[in-house]
Each structure stands twice: as structure tokens, then as C-alpha cells.
Amino acid sequence: MVTGSDLKESQHAVDIAREHSGLCYATVGVHPCSAKQFDTYPGGASALLSALRDLVQTSKAAGHAVAFGEIGLDYDRLFLTPKETQLKYFEAQLELAVEVQLPLFLHSRAASEDFERLLAAKLPLLPKKGLVHSFTGTVEEMRRMVDMQLDVGVNGCSLKTEDNVEVVRQIPVERLQIETDGPWCEMRPSHASAKYLKDAPPLPKAVKKEKWAQGLMVKGRNEPAAIPHVAWAIAKIKDIPVEDVCEA
């Protein structure tokens, strides 16, 4: 899954999905930290929404765009986009997602009350609800997401602390999705998840970017190739076979 965080990145994600059809798929949307682009876009917010609509309709019809996002709220980084701007354009994009009938690829940081309030008004209009990715919330917040029939995405950032681990332990397997969020959210030796990786199969060797070759990873960058370790840690945390995590 190649994620769009604004119009330009969404177009690039669709281009990658087209070039690697059947292997890569795209999301289309504007990330909350980029939502101020609606007010600076030539022609204003309505023009940007129209451009998003055109892109998502054509790419969905071609089988390349499979979700609307990454959209949501991020109150940890209000210095990037003010709260009221985030709220306004999260709601506008939810309306567009309902119009084009794509499941949601969602982002939420320190904004659970507003996030859930806006979602509750639109989710009944989406048969395929979506995913709250890179989940780092509380057990209570996770349960509310599950009650809303949303899936919960887990990556390295979801496994940093013992509290995070306990949340993951309680996510119903049928509502769990594994992800890397590369190039970010790598699993680190300092994280609470590290002890669950002691007997994990090794990942491909990581080298400096200028020494990269096919089959290797780039040092200091999280990559999709690291997803087996996410699945392995979750399996150990839940005390279930790793195959059950992957098949869920």
C-alpha cells in the first residue's frame, strides 16, 4: 500500500500502483498535517477537493486506488496545521470518501473525541469502514474503534511501550492489520517490542544507500521488508502462531 498525504503524493502513489499493478495499491487523500494546503491551493479548497475527486474516481475505476486517506486529526502537531483547519477538511474529505465509496485510511493523534465524533456521522454510509493506522491509543480507544467496525493497524510505533504492547495484546485478531509505515516507525532495540524478537528470523541485510543492491535494505530506513518482524512480535505478544497473525 502506497500512501498519499497530499494531492501531489497521492498522484505519485497512483503512478507507482499503475507501474506495479497487482503488487502495489494507492490511497488518495490529504494528511491532517498537510490540511492547510486546502487554503493555499490555486482556486481554493473547492478546487483541491475537485482535483482529489477526479484522481480518486479515475484511479479507483482502474483498480489502483483502494482507500481514501491518509486523513484524520493530529493534535500533537498543531504547529503544522491548526486544529480548526484540520477539523474542517477532515469532515470535507469524509464527505468525499462517502461520495466515492472508498474505505478510510485514518490517522489519529491526541484527538480521539473529535476524531470519533466526526467518524460516527459518516461511517454508517460506508459499507467498508476502513483502518486506523499506526495505532498508539489506549485500550479504551481501541475498543471504541473496533465497536465502530474499524480495523486497527499496528507497526513499530504501536509497540514502543509496555502500555502499547498491552493494547496490541487485546486487539481482536480479526480487526488487526500489520504495517510498517516505512520509512518511519521502525522497531528499535530500545522499544518494549524488542524482547519479542529474540528468536525472529533475520531481516535482509541493511547497507548504506549508495551500496544498495537488489535484496538488501537501506540502513536507517524502515521498509516493507521489515513487516515479518511486526507480525512476529504480535504473535509472541498474543501467544498465537505467526501464521494466524498473517492470515487475519
Residue ranges and their predicted role:
Residues 1-248:
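Mid-domain alpha/beta scaffold segments of enzyme catalytic cores
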